[in-house]
Amino acid sequence: DNPYVPEVKAMKGLTLYEVPQLSVTAAFFCQKVNPTGNPNIGSGKLDGNGIPVDFFADINVRKAFLHAFDRKTYKKDVFNDLVVMPSSPNIKGLPYHKDVPVYEFDLKKSADYMKKAWDGKVWDQGFKMIITHNTGNEMREAAAHMMAENIMSLNPKFQIEVRNVEWKDYLVKYRNFMYPIFIIGWGADYADPHNFMYTFMHSRGVYGRYMAYENPEVDRLCEAGIANVDPDKRREIYHKLQDLWYTEAIANTIYQQIVVRAYRDWVKGYVPNAMLTDANEMLMDIWKE
């Protein structure tokens, strides 16, 4: 675990491998929540006691939440700085990655966007909602609390509760559009941007569909990216998609983990693998020197 890495680094006779993973966790904004028996949206109205089902369809709300996430503090306090803070789902290590702008932590900008949201009704009426994370995941729990506390600090009429849900139930509920914000990760099935950008952005993607996010231009680009074999054309496509991730304020990519492996310095032959860090520990390929 990251808190113990400095202690391990101080030990003599060890070789450490820091391996950024081809995986990313994000907080997704659902733009059409299922209201049936749903406590996560309160009254289901913008009346101070809930949020409407399409609360996050207003880009001003999404931008407000993005500006309320303190990436630098999160990186230091949760990961001891040993993490990659991604700017889009096309994380470092994947082809055609580029750093796109992020919504830096700025509570004034967050408040300004909240004042614009829903023609000023969000700021005047206030709202109440619940953010959930899966039980036992401290990294996602910390992200949920950071969003909740910073948004609530903007206006006493903003009320957000954080709850944990068992993993098996979490999966069922986010797939039934029960969460206005759901926090979940994705690991590479194969090391290509399509596996991430389609998953996160396409209206039929594994996560895109459960955000109820639909953008014909995004769908077209996602489909063109996998259908094309020309590297230059693919680069252009995926650069556009990464730009759209920012301008559309689709969701909040929170972290790309770095796994640390420690071996005695006389152990040789370990080759880090960004997809299969643990499974790649092939004993037949490791030797003592």
What kind of region is each of these model predictions?
Residues 1-78, 84, 94-250, 286-289:
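Extracytoplasmic/periplasmic ligand-capture domains
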Residues 254:
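Glycine-rich and polybasic anion-binding loops at the starts of cofactor/ligand-binding domains
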Residues 261-289:
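Long beta-strand-rich cores associated with HINT superfamily self-processing modules
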